[in-house]
Amino acid sequence: MLLFLMLMTGFAGFVDSAAGGGGLISLPAYLFAGLPVHYTYGTNKFSAACGTTFATAQFFQKGAMNIRVGLLAAVGSFVGSALGSHIVLLLSDQVLRTMMLIILPVAAVLILWRRDLPDENRDDGTLNAKKAALALAIGLGIGLYDGIFGPGTGTFAIIAFTTLMGFDLRTANGNGKVLNLASNYASLFTYLMNGLVVFHIGIPCACLLYTSPSPRDGLLS
């Protein structure tokens, strides 16, 4: 079963870097393997945080982000995700499973819709109070979603940064990575403090994310 989870997590990482929505694969895989829902959330967040750390470093190295906007969004995202994760701890397994049945298809449709996003930079490079507040709000809202559910977070961030703030896809993707990094670690800390990470599963799955081939390189070239 561990081999199955490693393969599925690796595939989820590949899908996530190509089109977003890797959690649509990894979350059901953990549940199929028999992990209770809260342990599924915690273990999935562990491997996701490791993968996002690597991806964010790549985007930062290539300068494919607006660091000021990304950091502001990350602050909001950390707060929102921490709140969302604590909400998850209050919900029963049955409620969370029902949420998955409803949200998974919706997230999948929105990820497919992302293909029609404009790839045009309309940002003028300045950062005023309005833009700062918008970046914080984007981070807070998407972070809350990531803390409560998760799949599609990166895609929703790209949609927000392109449509609401006018960034091109490359920069929006980088901003989204910073946002998602903060939300992943906020959730991970919450689950770690509550003993909800299965390390003998999460560590091998996280290691596979580092070695999986990634189409991300084409975006950053």
Which residue stretches match the model-derived regions?
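Transmembrane helix exit motif
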Residues: 54-64, 101-127
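Interfacial loop-to-helix junctions that mark the boundaries of transmembrane helices
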Residues: 90-99
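Hydrophobic mid-bilayer segments of alpha-helices in multi-pass membrane transport proteins
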Residues: 100-102, 156-157
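Juxtamembrane cytosolic amphipathic helices that cap and anchor the N-termini
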Residues: 130-135
